Amino acid sequence: MTNGNNNNLEFAELKIRGKLFKLPILKASIGKDVIDISRVSAEADYFTYDPGFMSTASCQSTITYIDGDKGILWYRGYDIKDLAEKSDFLEVAYLMIYGELPSSDQYCNFTKKVAHHSLVNERLHYLFQTFCSSSHPMAIMLAAVGSLSAFYPDLLNFNETDYELTAIRMIAKIPTIAAMSYKYSIGQPFIYPDNSLDFTENFLHMMFATPCTKYKVNPIIKNALNKIFILHADHEQNASTSTVRIAGSSGANPFACISTGIASLWGPAHGGANEAVINMLKEIGSSENIPKYVAKAKDKNDPFRLMGFGHRVYKSYDPRAAVLKETCKEVLNELGQLDNNPLLQIAIELEALALKDEYFIERKLYPNVDFYSGIIYKAMGIPSQMFTVLFAIARTVGWMAQWKEMHEDPEQKISRPRQLYTGYVHREYKCIVERK
């Protein structure tokens, strides 16, 4: 690394076949700096190769910071643990969209706007009726969110003045669509939003009330779900967020962009992992079986894997998992299940054993955010097919903040990754009768 004279930049040097290239080093406010390789292909006639974008920064962002080695997660500079304990989801949503925590008046106005936009067009009910009763709620939600662009044709050609309203509309309508997806999947009537309730209470109301039975929100359950939403609101440039940015880079309407994020989130390696944790705990069955399954997880020839352990970014304890572990105990204690919930007992003993095992220590495999969230959902009465739907409700805030930031970035270009072509070189076409 050498010091450059161009605006006090530092440069990295890359030598290709005897030719030296000076690559600017872009300074991060905290964390790893970035080598700017954007001119390499033009000047050196080479592309860079980075499968999975493990070492590539695709954008500049001021929204979320992660230090995976130290177990740090910040939203706009605020520690995730502080936000989970002291804030609420819509305050965090405001922070994500606008960059600062709101004043009392700003918070009040923001929550009123979200409540105002929580209804969806009545014609959307007809779309739900086209799905078979066994349809997965994520499939229904994916289609419903994408269809919103048909109800807001003005956003097919959006501009900067639309960013705020678009974010509010999306944050407001996603819980309604999520609850509608659930109600349809179990054959119950849709429940309309109630603007006298706050964001989390309203979602629980739409999920569990019926036209003939009111749902009384337990404050412990509400607080737990509020924390879960905050903890899942954003996580830097993960698969679904990158998908939203890539779709948005083409100028696609925001509802279409969010639907692509939902599709990516649905993958079992991304948003579906907490459901896999529940299935794994059920398979283990009892505490006595834990050593056997830990041994299976360490056997490279055994297909069994411990779900909820390890993370692409975190090489220490996931800070979100630490919050959720305590939240899980609070919820189960409130419901009278703390000492007799078999899934929690297996999870706690499995974690304790894994954290003392050299295999997991050497590989830095610690519990992640998915390890305890599924147990909380299950205790709340939320079925496993809804786990990823709730993830999408929370992550919509991050997607919209990232989408807005992308469109406000003067350096933004349409995304166009390159490839290393390893296929055939030119071949001559032969008529079908000449082929063997």
Swiss-Prot record:
Allosterically inhibited by NADH. Keywords: Allosteric enzyme, Transferase, Tricarboxylic acid cycle. Pathway: Carbohydrate metabolism; tricarboxylic acid cycle; isocitrate from oxaloacetate: step 1/2. It catalyses: oxaloacetate + acetyl-CoA + H2O = citrate + CoA + H(+). Its EC number is 2.3.3.16. It comes from the Bacteria. It is an enzyme of class 2 (transferase). The active site is at H311, D370. GO terms for cellular component: cytoplasm. One of its GO terms (molecular function) is citrate (Si)-synthase activity. GO terms for biological process: tricarboxylic acid cycle. InterPro entries: Citrate_synth-like_lrg_a-sub, Citrate_synth-like_sm_a-sub, Citrate_synthase, Citrate_synthase_AS, Citrate_synthase_bac-typ, Citrate_synthase_sf, Citrate_synthase_typ-I. Disulfide bonds: none annotated. SUPFAM superfamilies: Citrate synthase. Homohexamer. NCBIfam families: cit_synth_I, PRK05614.1. Citrate synthase is found in nearly all cells capable of oxidative metabolism. Belongs to the citrate synthase family. This is Citrate synthase. The lineage of its organism: Bacteria, Pseudomonadati, Pseudomonadota, Alphaproteobacteria, Rickettsiales.
